[in-house]
Amino acid sequence: MMLEYALVLSAFLFSIGIYGLITSRNMVRALMCLELILNAVNMNLVTFSYFFDNRQLKGDIFSIFIIAIAAAEAAIGLAIVSSIYRNRKSTRIDQSNLLNN
């Protein structure tokens, strides 16, 4: 019975992340929504690993790998956003066309 609750929560987090990513106009908010999506995927991996793969822990190891990649992605993304903010004085996605001067 706990499997259904974990999957519903993960689907809810994933849906919130997708909705926020589609409707977000701020780059920092879009990065946060992307992190929410990755956390929902990690929750699915750990849940399925717990219920269906008790001995090998492949899902747990893979989720730790995803967390490390997500941390690097967040650091690089925030560095890019801060650089864009320093140059353009805005973090709005629709105002930051980097191909124009």
UniProtKB/Swiss-Prot annotation:
Gene Ontology MF terms in the entry: oxidoreductase activity, acting on NAD(P)H, quinone or similar compound as acceptor; quinone binding
Q: Which domain of life is it from?
A: Eukaryota
Alphabetically sorted, this entry's keywords are: Chloroplast, Membrane, NAD, NADP, Plastid, Plastoquinone, Quinone, Thylakoid, Translocase, Transmembrane, Transmembrane helix, Transport
Oxidoreductase as a keyword of this entry, yes or no, is no
What is any one GO biological process for this UniProt entry? photosynthesis, light reaction
Q: Which residues form a coiled coil?
A: none
Query: Cross-referenced InterPro entries, in alphabetical order?
Result: NADH_UbQ_OxRdtase_chain4L/K, NUOK/Mnh_C1-like
EC assignment: the record states 7.1.1.-
| UniProt catalytic activity | a plastoquinone + NADH + (n+1) H(+)(in) = a plastoquinol + NAD(+) + n H(+)(out); a plastoquinone + NADPH + (n+1) H(+)(in) = a plastoquinol + NADP(+) + n H(+)(out)
Q: How does it sit in the membrane?
A: Multi-pass membrane protein
What does the record give as the function of this protein?
NDH shuttles electrons from NAD(P)H:plastoquinone, via FMN and iron-sulfur (Fe-S) centers, to quinones in the photosynthetic chain and possibly in a chloroplast respiratory chain. The immediate electron acceptor for the enzyme in this species is believed to be plastoquinone. Couples the redox reaction to proton translocation, and thus conserves the redox energy in a proton gradient.
> NCBIfam families under this entry?
PRK05715.1-2, PRK05715.1-4
> Subunit arrangement?
NDH is composed of at least 16 different subunits, 5 of which are encoded in the nucleus.
Family of this protein: Belongs to the complex I subunit 4L family.
Protein name, entry field = NAD(P)H-quinone oxidoreductase subunit 4L, chloroplastic
The protein's organism comes out as Ipomoea purpurea
Q: Which gene encodes it?
A: ndhE
